Amino acid sequence: MNRIILFLLAFLCIVEAQAQGKHKTVNLTPPRPKVGVVLSGGGAKGAAHIGVLKYLEEIGMPVDYVVGTSMGSIIGGLYAMGYSPDELAQLIANMNWSQYVGNSIDRSAMSEEVRKRSSTMAVNIPFSFNGILNKKEAGNTVSFLPSAYVNNTSLINLFNDLCVGYQKDMDFNDLPIPFACVATDIKTGKEVDIRHGSVPLAMRASMAIPGVFSPVNMDGHLLVDGGLVNNFPADLLQEMGANIIIGVDVSDRDTIHDGEILSLPEVLNGLVDNAVNSKRDDNQAICDIYLAPDITGYGTMSFTHEAIDTLVQRGYQKAKEFREPLMKIKQHLESKSNGPLTKQLRASKARNLADAPVYVSSIVLNQTNQKKSVWLLKKGHLKVNEFLSEKDINHAIDVYRGTGAFDDITYNLTENGIDTIHGTAQETYTLSMNFKPTHPHVFGLGIRYDTEEGAALLLNLGINEKMLSGFKLSLTGKLSYNPKFNITGTYSNLNLGNFSMAYDYRSEHYKAMIFDKSNTNLQYSQHKFSAYASPFRLINFSNTIGISYTATSFDRLTPFDFSNDTINQTLISSVNFQNNNLLSPFIRISYDNRDLNYYAKHGIYTIFKCLFHFDTKGKASTVPELYYSFLGYLTPYNSRFTIIPQVYARCIFKSPTMANLWNIVGGEVASRHFDQQFPFIGIYHTDFVNDLATVLRCDLRYRLFEKHYITATYNFLYGRNLFGKNHSITEDNIYSGVGLQYAYNSFIGPISLTAQWSDYTKQFSAYFSIGYSF
C-alpha cells in the first residue's frame, strides 16, 4: 500500500514538472505588441479613413483592433468584418446617401393612399390619442412628435445587407478583427462603449445624429451619436489591449469658417467638435501616430463620387507622409514576431447580400398576427425554400413601408447550417422580419398659393388611416376662396379590398368665357354622396365601382347681354344653369407607375372612367359619359430632358342641358372647378366645349440644376358637336396654345411661373403658384 502511494506521488511530481516546463517554454517568446487603429467621426469626410487603411495594408502593417465613432464606426466595423479598403471605397461611393438620410422609398412601392397624401400634404404627423393623453398626464404634450427626421429602417437594413454572418448578438472580439464603437446615452449624457451585441445596430447607434436620425434602444440605453462625448476614442483602444495606436482624425478642428456649415448635420457636427475638444486632446496625446488628412473643401454630407475619391486619396497621401515612423513600427513588430507580418483575420469575412442571394428555408414575421403575416408574405412576394437576394428582401420591406402602417421594419438572417440544395451543399438561413407599427392616426397639412385662386390651406385628419385593416375615417377641409370639405368612412379588408362611403361639399367661384364672350363670373355649390368599392389592392393598378348622388345649385349667374344672339338666348335660358340632382353609377380604372409625384422621369399615369347620369327630377334624359386621360414620361438615357406626351378626352353621348355636365377646359390645374375639367395652357380661366372634347399636349422639360426645371408646352384642343345644338367655344375648330414654365421643386411643393398664349384668347397671360396641387 505504501509503495502504491509513493508511486502516485512520484507520478504527480513528474506531471507537474512537465507542465511547468511547458509553461516556461511558452513565455520564452512573448507575443508581439498589438496595433490598434482609431477612426474619428466626420460624416462623408470619413472616406479619408479608407485611404489610410489602404496604405497600412500596402506596407504590411497589421491591424489587431479597430475602434470608431459615427462614420468611423461604419468604416471600422466593416473593415473589422473583413472588407478590404478597395471594397469599402466602392461601397461608400455607390451608396445612395440621400435615400438613406431622407429615409425615402420608391414611389412604386407606395400604396395609392400614401401616394395621394405625399402629393398633396407638405406635413404629415402620425399620432395616437392614447399617446397624447399619456404625455399630457406627464406634462409633455408635444413628445408624440417624431424623435428625428429619419428612423432606423433604411440605415439598419443597409448595414444588415453588408453584415450577413454577423447580424446576431455576439462578442465583437470574435469578429475577424476585434472591434468597438462609441455611442452616447441621452438619458444620462454619458459615453457607452459598445463591444458586444448586434454589429449593425451598434454602427447605427454610433452615428445617430440627434434630430436627424432616431435614437437606438440597446441594452437598456437610448443611444445617439458617440461624437457627442468621444469623437476620437483612442482611450478605448488602450482598454482593449492595444500597445501601439494609430489615430485618424477627420473632424473639423480649426477648419470651420463663415458660411461653410450649410446643412443640419454639419451644424451639429461643428457643435460636437467644440464640445469634445478637451477629450480629443487627451486621446491625441496617447496616439503613437496621429494622422489628420486634409479635408478642406468637403463637409459632412459630401457623398458624391468625386468627393469620396478625393478624400480616399487624401487619406492615403497623409498616411504616406508618415511612411518613416510607420515603417519603424513595422520593423519593431517584425523583430518581436516569429515570421513576416501578414494580414490575419480571426474569422471568415462577412457576406455582402448584394453579391449573392441566400437560401431561405424559413421566414418569421414578428409583431404581426397570422392573418397579417400571410397577407404580408404574399404582398412582398417572399417565399420559403427559395434563394432571396438583397433586392428581394429590401423590395418587400419597401412595399411594407409603403402601406404606411409601419414605423420601423428591420430584418436579420440566421444561419441554420449546411443542407443539400439542388445537389449542392448550401448554407441555409432563417429570415426574421421585425415590424414596429406606427401611430394609427395622422394629421396632414398642405399649403398653396396661385394667381387664379389665391391662398389655400388643406387640413386632414385620418383616424386609423395607418392601420392595415379595419374601419378608417378621413376628414379633409380646404380653406380658400373656393372651399371644399370631405368626410370618408372606409372599411378595409386585407382580402376583399376597401368599401367606402363619402360626403363632399364644394363651393366654386370662377370665371368662364361662355359662348365666346368675355370672362363671366360664375358660382355654384355642390353636395355629393358616394358609396363605392375598391376590390383590388395592387400597387400601380386601382379600380373603383360605385354610385354617387350629386345636388348642384347655381347660386348666382352674372347677366349676359345676348339681345342680338337668339341662339345663345335659348342656350342660356332657364334650363342650363338651374339646380339639378343627378344619380350616377360609375366605374373608374387607373394605372400609375410614375417614379415621382412631381417632375417624374419615367412611367405613365392613365385614367378611364365610365358614368351614367340620371336626372332624378326627370327633367332631362340619361347622359352616358366616357373619360380618358394619359400622361407619359420618357427620359432618354437618363438625360436632363424629359418628354411628356398627354391626352385628355371626354365624350358625353347626349347633349346635356345641365351646365355641370358639359366638357370644360382651361387653367393649369386639372379638375380645379369641375371634376371633368381639362387643363389647357393658353386659356387662363375656363370655357365650355362640345359633346366630344380632346386635348393633345406635349411638354419638353429640361432640368437646369438639381430641382430646377424649364418646361416648354404645346397643346391643342379639338371639340365636336355630336348631339344636339352647339353650345361650345370650338364650333368644330382646332385651337392651340403654347407656354413656357420655370419651376423649382421645393420641400413644400413646386414653385412655378408660367407664361402662356393661345390663338383662342389671342392674349398673353402669366400664372404663378406655390405648393402642391389640391
Predicted region positions:
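Gram-negative/organellar outer-membrane beta-barrel architecture
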Residues: 390-391, 402, 408-418, 424-587, ...
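Buried hydrophobic packing residues in well-ordered domains
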Residues: 42, 72, 88, 189, ...
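C-terminal outer-membrane beta-barrel translocator/porin domains of Gram-negative envelope proteins
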Residues: 442-447, 575, 585-705
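Short glycine-rich beta-strand segments
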Residues: 506-508, 550-552, 609-615, 650-654, ...
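Positively charged n-region of N-terminal signal peptides that target proteins for export
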Residues: 1-4, 19-20
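C-terminal hydrophobic structural anchor segments
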Residues: 701-735
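Sec-dependent N-terminal signal peptides
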Residues: 4-13
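Patatin-like phospholipase
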Residues: 19-69, 77-398, 402-415, 435-438
